[in-house]
Regions:
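Conserved SAM-binding strand-loop segment of SAM-dependent methyltransferases
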Residues: 235-244
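Short acidic-glycine-tyrosine-enriched beta hairpin
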Residues: 26-48
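Glycine- and acidic-residue-biased ligand/ion/polar-headgroup-sensing regions
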Residues: 7-26
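N-terminal juxtadomain amphipathic helix
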Residues: 95-173
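Double-stranded beta-helix
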Residues: 57-94
Length: 244
């Protein structure tokens, strides 16, 4: 239910199941939509004037407690106000891509520490400004078991990389960075012509190209078909494949 309470504080105790809580502070013009994974036994407290909705991941049982009077004929007057925070399309995108476990060690001990609101896919250019587009939460979680940082959502590769427009080599500063990195790695790791360097998510081969110039064998793995084609054309052997 997309709604907010102008006066009352809402408390939700999840007895069983799990859901994704989405909130937005309506009194702060700079606030963004934030998500939070709620698991059984946890209590969510929603202050007044915070828009709120839930996306359930499984059948769940919860106790919904709101301070103050609550008459059924009072809905939308002073007690509970409608506010469309999440539409059907956004809800489906989140259900499809939200990660409840660490993608490295499968731990459920994920702690969010960066929340930047909803964002369209990178370089997802529209033909017309009126065209609709997909949005996803842009948030970073920290796994307290393996210490890996990762996005809270994993957009399906086909949707993300069907026609990827970003090319790393368009930036001279980025090129220089990887040239210096290649030199440093060659010295510190004693890389030779017998070595093999594999770059997963290699884009157009910006990191591997200076290694090849040193005579070091290199292989790129790139999920975007159009970008992998460019890398191969530029002499950087690249396999078009998604690694997840």
């Amino acid at each position: 239910g997309n709604h907010y309470h102008p006066i009352q504080t809402q408390k939700c105790l999840l007895v069983s199941g799990s859901y994704i809580s989405l909130t937005k502070d309506l009194l702060d013009e700079n606030s963004v939509v934030e998500t939070l994974l709620v698991k059984a036994g946890e209590l969510s407290i929603i202050p007044p004037n915070v828009a709120h909705t839930m996306i359930f991941l499984e059948d769940s049982v919860l106790l919904n407690l709101v301070t103050g009077e609550r008459e059924h004929d009072n809905y939308g007057i002073t007690h509970t106000m409608k506010y469309e925070l999440v539409d059907k399309r956004l809800a489906e995108n989140i259900l499809e891509s939200y990660k409840t476990e660490c993608r490295v060690c499968e731990s459920q001990n994920l702690e969010p520490y960066i929340k930047l609101g909803l964002s369209p896919l990178a370089n997802n250019l529209l033909e017309k400004k009126e065209d609709d587009y997909d949005r996803y939460p842009l948030e970073v979680n920290f796994c307290s078991d393996c210490f890996n940082s990762q996005l809270s959502v994993a957009v399906p590769s086909k949707k993300m990389f069907d026609n990827y427009l970003y090319l790393s080599s368009t930036t001279d500063t980025f090129k220089l960075h990887f040239e210096e990195l290649a030199k440093k790695l060659k010295m510190e790791l004693n890389l030779t012509k017998q070595s093999l360097v594999v770059d997963i998510g290699s884009n157009d081969g910006i990191f591997l190209k200076p290694l090849l110039d040193y005579g070091i064998e290199a292989l790129g793995v790139e999920p975007a078909k159009n970008v992998a084609k460019i890398a191969n054309k530029n002499g950087v052997k690249t396999v078009n494949r998604s690694v997840a």
